[in-house]
Regions:
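Generic alpha-helical hydrophobic packing signal
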Residues: 7, 27, 53-56
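Short, conserved catalytic or interaction motifs in soluble domains
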Residues: 37, 62-64
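Helix-turn-helix/winged-helix DNA-binding modules
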Residues: 13, 39-42
Length: 64
């Protein structure tokens, strides 16, 4: 799942644990873990908030 890959990439590049990312974003560590495992749905807005909290920028591309 794309959201899981995005969170894993952010954590790897920023060298953050799940707990550290959770603290940055105001989410619980268990929520971050569930998103990364693909067992938790996440809205685009929440994903964007997490990415921005970690200093990134979410871009969505639509190809038709």
């Amino acid at each position: 799942y794309q959201a899981a890959n995005i969170l894993l990439k952010i954590r790897a590049e920023k060298q953050l644990s799940q707990s550290e990312l959770a603290n940055l974003t105001g989410k619980k560590q268990s929520y971050i873990a569930r998103v990364e495992k693909g067992t938790q749905n996440i809205s685009v807005q929440t994903l964007n908030d997490i990415v921005e909290s970690a200093g990134g920028k979410l871009k969505i591309e639509v190809v038709v």
